[in-house]
From Swiss-Prot:
The keyword Membrane does not apply. The lineage of its organism: Eukaryota, Metazoa, Ecdysozoa, Arthropoda, Hexapoda. Keywords: Cytoplasm, Initiation factor, Protein biosynthesis, RNA-binding. This is Eukaryotic translation initiation factor 3 subunit G-1. The keyword RNA-binding applies. The gene is eIF3g1.
Length: 269
């Protein structure tokens, strides 16, 4: 019986057959660098050796970050060493995020909120808002302001000839005294325009009673609806009070509208 001939293989094939897989991953630390060596198969099903080099550096991190790095891994990574695993984690460049408050950015970029560009100024409290929106409107501060303006306008009407400014003829007559042959002084009447439809006689009286005494008030109303037409006439007993009313109320904000006050034109007989 002939003997069986044995065919000897190469030593590399024998080592591979004895091992039966890829060599384990190794890590070495030298001169502040960590070298990670691992083996894997490429696209051609050949063994390849991959060496990764990491530079070891120390940095100060928050306590929460340091504590999170000591957490015990779980699942298929429960036996992994601390730190990222190259097979399950891909380390990319660090991205620093900065969170901004969108409302603060809108306020910073809003030109209307710039104090140097704010053109609104309250005549009651000198705040940076319109007089219509003043929180002190109708309070003692507003009342004192109207009284001061009335006194200033009255004194200006008396002292006007001394200053060299133009004075209407009816103001000159008022300084001389008397109303002449006319039974009613129509030259002390003013016309208030741009009133709201909800304006009433009580509101009109409340608007002008602090300036001076009146002899007559007329609020124009629509015959069909009974609503205010938007204008009214007020006759003061003294011309200086009428002049003060024009000075105070012209351009004054009332009921979300800007009033327009002027001298009433006399009717032709």
């Amino acid at each position: 019986m002939p003997g069986v001939e044995t065919i000897k293989s190469s030593w590399a094939d024998e080592v591979e057959l004895d091992y039966g897989g890829l060599p384990p991953t190794t890590e070495t630390v030298e001169n502040g660098h960590k070298y990670v060596t691992e083996y894997k198969y490429n696209k051609d099903d050949k063994k390849t050796k991959v060496v990764r080099t990491y530079k070891i550096s120390k940095q100060v991190v928050p306590k929460t970050v340091a504590k999170r790095r000591t957490w015990t891994k779980f699942g298929e990574s429960k036996n992994d060493k601390p730190g990222p695993n190259s097979q399950t984690t891909m380390v990319s460049e660090e991205i620093i995020m900065q969170f901004l408050n969108s409302k603060e950015d809108e306020k910073a970029n809003d030109p209307l909120l710039d104090p140097s560009k704010n053109i609104a100024k309250c005549r009651i409290c000198n705040g940076e808002h319109w007089s219509v929106n003043c929180p002190y409107k109708g309070t003692a501060m507003d009342t004192n302001l109207m009284e001061k303006k009335a006194a200033a306008a009255a004194s200006a009407a008396v002292d006007a000839p001394k200053s060299g400014k133009y004075v209407p003829p009816f103001l000159k007559d008022s300084q001389k005294g008397g109303m002449g042959m006319r039974g009613r002084d129509d030259t002390a009447a003013i016309r208030i325009s741009n009133l709201s439809e909800s304006m009433t006689e009580a509101d009109l009286e409340e608007l002008v009673k602090k300036i001076g005494p009146q002899s007559k008030m007329y609020l124009a109303r629509d015959k069909n609806t009974g609503l205010c037409k938007g204008f009214a006439y007020v006759h003061f007993k003294q011309r200086k009070d009428a002049a003060a009313a024009i000075e105070i109320l012209n351009g004054h904000g009332y009921d979300h509208l800007i009033l327009s006050v002027e001298w009433s034109k006399p009717q032709n007989n």
